[in-house]
Amino acid sequence: SSYTDMLCPQIETAGTSSWVAFFDNGFRVYEGTNKPKETVSVSEDGEILSCAYADDRVVLILRGESDDHPYRMKIYNLKGKQLADENLDFYYQNLQIEEKQILLTNRQELCVYTLKGRKKYSGMVSETQIHEILGMGQNRYLLAEEDGVSMIRLK
């Protein structure tokens, strides 16, 4: 493979001898310890805005194609199989995977998706700015906010 004119801003460990490397146009999976070999390569045509890896899932957020859906979320497994392709109407600032769920947050709102792309929750969860969110299990989340810490539980 040629890596000329490519950016690789993020590499995640995916087990004892596997890695996920995010590039400006997609991601690649490498396996092996001494001389890792590329086993999967996924390329996207659209602009990738955010990426995350956890629980054997790769999540890419791309620029959407309309004002009604400013973003598009694609979910892949480590074999490169696309599991979901969802248009998003939620204006997010942060993407993370916690407790086997995809969390999109902005200043005061949270949007939760399953690792298969099904929306579980979307709404306001804070009166002040959310700085960090941590999954605590059983649909409970700890919010680190501008003015303190609070616990929320999603039904």
Q: Positions of the model-derived regions?
A:
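Blade-level signature of beta-propeller repeat domains, shared across WD40, Kelch, NHL, RCC1
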Residues: 120, 126-155
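Structural motif
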Residues: 24-31, 67-74, 109-113, 148-155
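Residue position within the beta-strands of beta-propeller blades
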Residues: 21, 60-61, 104, 142-143
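A short beta-strand motif characteristic of beta-propeller blades
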Residues: 1-3, 35-42, 79-86, 118-124
